[in-house]
Amino acid sequence: MYCRESLSSLQTLNVAKSLSSLFPKQSALINPISAGRRNNLPRPNLRRRCKVTASRANIEQEGNTVKEPIQNIKVKGYITAQEEFLEGITWSRGLDDIADIRGRSLLVELISAKTDQRITVEDYAQRVWAEAPDEKYECEFEMPEDFGPVGAIKIQNQYHRQLFLKGVELKLPGGSITFTCESWVAPKSVDPTKRIFFSDKSYLPSQTPEPLKKYRKEELETLQGKNREEVGEFTKFERIYDYDVYNDVGDPDNDPELARPVIGGLTHPYPRRCKTGRKPCETDPSSEQRYGGEFYVPRDEEFSTAKGTSFTGKAVLAALPSIFPQIESVLLSPQEPFPHFKAIQNLFEEGIQLPKDAGLLPLLPRIIKALGEAQDDILQFDAPVLINRDRFSWLRDDEFARQTLAGLNPYSIQLVEEWPLISKLDPAVYGDPTSLITWEIVEREVKGNMTVDEALKNKRLFVLDYHDLLLPYVNKVRELNNTTLYASRTLFFLSDDSTLRPVAIELTCPPNINKPQWKQVFTPGYDATSCWLWNLAKTHAISHDAGYHQLISHWLRTHACTEPYIIAANRQLSAMHPIYRLLHPHFRYTMEINARARQSLVNGGGIIETCFWPGKYALELSSAVYGKLWRFDQEGLPADLIKRGLAEEDKTAEHGVRLTIPDYPFANDGLILWDAIKEWVTDYVKHYYPDEELITSDEELQGWWSEVRNIGHGDKKDEPWWPVLKTQDDLIGVVTTIAWVTSGHHAAVNFGQYGYGGYFPNRPTTTRIRMPTEDPTDEALKEFYESPEKVLLKTYPSQKQATLVMVTLDLLSTHSPDEEYIGEQQEASWANEPVINAAFERFKGKLQYLEGVIDERNVNITLKNRAGAGVVKYELLKPTSEHGVTGMGVPYSISI
């Protein structure tokens, strides 16, 4: 149970007692531990402080039994921790210094894994070393010989501040026992219960030593919130994992225009998010209040100190709402288009002056340049790799097509299997369902090389099809200020050299009260007018892909859909469960980054709504896609490729599938990564579950998967495609899919965002005016014929929208200095098991092999989708990276 008092209230404690009454006089009241120095104060007698007690019942039970005296053995304990950063000198800091001097920093208790606890073995740990960022503590126990192996420890934080406990090592005569903690421990004044940590040895529930079973159960109940007596908002120090709907993205109490529907439930199905316990809004009880401060996530889900203070983490995400008004204030015409392309180029070459006192330099050091003490700072973006390699590549049709296979969103291109293209929407509402892209147009554009029937048979036609997804939103989005929308289809033809060529773009508007359905097909032109119309149509089509990428391929399929796996794992899988330990690296920081996204990215009036074409319908649209298209069994890479017609099963092929497009960089690299992950998971699962009965009888494992399906993804719980955990293959498939989504999938759609989207004409996030050929006026046609470049610039995002997106994409594309890349470091529990350690080393070797393969492929000029003059190399699935914006690196988890 957590006390409601804040730490600040602890500062009012009476500390006026003479220090001489507590301990011998010292020359000064200062912390004797300075960075890099050992504490030279006399240590209290450890033997005297070590407490070994027995219960009265045990004494009475054995009172008549004569036994040989039990010998004690000495056990040394070494603890590594990091303190919470607190600025300045506070009363609580003074009290903590007193605790250090008295040698009572942490209370540590040992838990036997052999027999039920008959005695208590505990000691106070004293801080003996402090060298930023780590602190070292030591303690010594006298443990009875028959105590048995230590299976767990309990720790109570005697400080008046939080402590990040990294790990504990116990040194016994027969060897060492390690406890990897990686957890924040609240002060005793806030949480008086002792925190339990289990050793690095993993146990299935049925194999858990009997004395540890009750602790295993109690810890899960704590994380489920069963021991919480209070009601209301969860506090910063709590570790409760629970579910809620997305009812906190709107802010109706602050502005009625920011009211948003609840996302999650029958009307708008969606994955669940972490519960915060905040009060309902006064103006809309179905929504949750968004008052100031950080959104709750369980304490151990928050960023570490390193990530939290870096410009890629908490600091910038929290500051986005205040950063953007300052940037907007220095733009000459924030709501207007850029006047010419040179003005866009100047964002990289000259920059924009910022007031010296804006305070943005520490937050955005990559893009804010300091010119000197007396001069203003400059907002100047680094040129993205796309225009660094070829300044005009974004204009070319071949680059437009190449990016569907090797760009930012390789998840949308699909094979055309039926002709003609026909909508599945109700024609009574949306008009004629048949596409205007006819066989005559296709055969003309492919120069008579083959008929449509031959192209279908030979799998030569591919499409970006956003028609049925967008058409229901067109009229609604067009009612928003300075925004337009079409439903689009973009058709591509596969050439003999495995490159795609755009054939046609169809833009459609549904009928409304004032006019009938409108649609038109645009093709690459060979005269000035048709060329400009084609470029304008291409701009609309690319913006649709950019919005779909951000909302669906990125946010929905990785961030939002992963959160329920994390919540369920912490509620149902013990920290000593082998599957928890296998998945835990893949869950690092995701809940925190999702909470930040709800605060400033996907919230009402946030970046997505302000700068992307769906506007206030963004999450509503992603809900529609989740309800219609999302299937867990199709989230693995091979299944996704097969679903889109980009591969077919072939057991004789290297990865068990044969690609429809041989030079598909994302798929070619991704399948190697997928296989490496699957082989690692297979070795791991078969080690801990040699008998399939162990899977079906594992109540924690079954409880986790049941909660994922029935609560976390409860809006789709009745779907027939959910896997059932009965066999090794079932479990391997589920775990491999989750590991892939959090690592390879997310890396492929995230870390190239600035490289491809930083120059926004390549990836415009919205379009603001209609095609000149839709209900043309004399004035609009005149402007188009006299200044088509001006019309294109008006179609692009405004100066404000473009600049804010560039700042955001730079942030989202940045690797943190403390990034943990897949296969780079192994968990301590893996290293302690020889079979698992060997399997991990094989996994690591396969990832190193992938790095070499990617390097070789990127210099093979026969692979035209990833190599050639000015072509951006495909490196998004290279496993490791330096920190910063690199366009490569696959972290274990969705950490940004």
From Swiss-Prot:
Belongs to the lipoxygenase family. 13S-lipoxygenase that can use linolenic acid as substrates. Plant lipoxygenases may be involved in a number of diverse aspects of plant physiology including growth and development, pest resistance, and senescence or responses to wounding. Catalyzes the hydroperoxidation of lipids containing a cis,cis-1,4-pentadiene structure. Required for the wound-induced synthesis of jasmonic acid (JA) in leaves. It is found in: Plastid, Chloroplast; Cytoplasm. Residues 1-56 form a transit peptide. SUPFAM superfamilies: Lipase/lipooxygenase domain (PLAT/LH2 domain), Lipoxigenase. The lineage of its organism: Eukaryota, Viridiplantae, Streptophyta, Embryophyta, Tracheophyta. Pathway: Lipid metabolism; oxylipin biosynthesis. This is Lipoxygenase 2, chloroplastic. The gene is LOX2.
